[in-house]
């Protein structure tokens, strides 16, 4: 059974992937570089995704061993502590190429969880 903590982490990952994709939609890497507000918003989404991934139980991460969990969880440290070296191109490529497989895994986990005690915590 999925714990409430894990369910909340999964919903945070799902919601922030959707936001990052929405914010970066239609932008080239050059446009993202020029739009500091969007760059900061997308980077914050990636930071939340990283932190929420740390809250997932190991057995859940093991079910999705195709995902680079260590890199996902470690990315947040870069966004928080090495923020002056976060490259727009890497953020853009992450949104364009790496979030879809994570979103698919998260949605599978949420779909397999019982619906009766869904602990969604945001409007």
How should these model regions be labeled?
Residues 1-123:
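Solvent-exposed interaction patches of small proteins and small membrane subunits
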């Amino acid at each position: 059974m999925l714990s409430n903590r894990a369910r909340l982490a999964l919903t945070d990952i799902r919601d922030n992937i959707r936001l990052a994709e929405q914010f970066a939609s239609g932008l080239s890497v050059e446009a993202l570089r020029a739009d500091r507000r969007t760059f900061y918003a997308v980077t914050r989404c990636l930071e939340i995704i990283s932190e929420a991934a740390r809250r997932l139980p190991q057995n859940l991460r093991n079910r999705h061993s195709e995902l680079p969990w260590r890199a996902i969880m470690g990315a947040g440290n870069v966004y928080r502590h090495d923020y002056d070296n976060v490259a727009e191109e890497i953020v853009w490529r992450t949104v364009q190429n790496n979030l879809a497989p994570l979103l698919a895994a998260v949605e599978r986990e949420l779909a397999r969880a019982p619906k009766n005690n869904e602990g969604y915590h945001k409007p």
